[in-house]
Amino acid sequence: VFHVSLAEHIQATLSESDRRLHDKGFCGHSSLRGVSSAMLNSWNQIIVNLLREIYTNIERYADKSEYSVIVTFSNNAVDIVQVNKCRQKSRRCVTLGVRKGLSIYSRLISGQGGFIRYEKDGEEWSFYCMLPLLT
């Protein structure tokens, strides 16, 4: 049984992940917008785990220039928007992450009515996800 609000857990994950990336020389920011009374449960934990996957991918494939992660609560859903530039050496920015972690999350999330979209345009990686909040 979880007794932590989802918003508190997400904010802690964003702050911790920003600190970790900043310590490794990355520039960027994360923010949480909106309000939710949802509590952390096994489904909502997937949101937190997906955020950790996103930060791992930033660390692996992103240029150390500006990154952005924005999490927004809205109408029984959570939206995640993430952008960064890919490292010059990591031209495979899209293919590496998609085959493993993101594809697993995409299947889980689409099974509950959400979706993940991502693309690489030139050197810019963009990611968008909508996850329903389940109680």
Annotate the PLM regions:
Residues 24-52:
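Conserved short strand/loop->alpha-helix "switch" segment adjacent to the catalytic nucleotide/phosphoryl-transfer site
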Residues 54-62:
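Short helix-loop "hinge" at the ATP-lid/N-box region of the Bergerat-fold HATPase_c
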Residues 85-87, 132-135:
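Two-component histidine kinase transmitter core
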Residues 92-122:
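ATP phosphate-binding glycine-rich loop and adjacent ATP-lid/helix-beta elements
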Residues 1-26:
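Short beta-to-alpha transition helix within the HATPase_c
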Residues 123-134:
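Short C-terminal beta-strand
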Residues 66-77, 83-84, 122:
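Short beta-strand/loop element within the Bergerat-fold HATPase_c
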Residues 29-33, 70-72, 119:
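Solvent-exposed beta-strand sheet faces enriched in polar/charged residues
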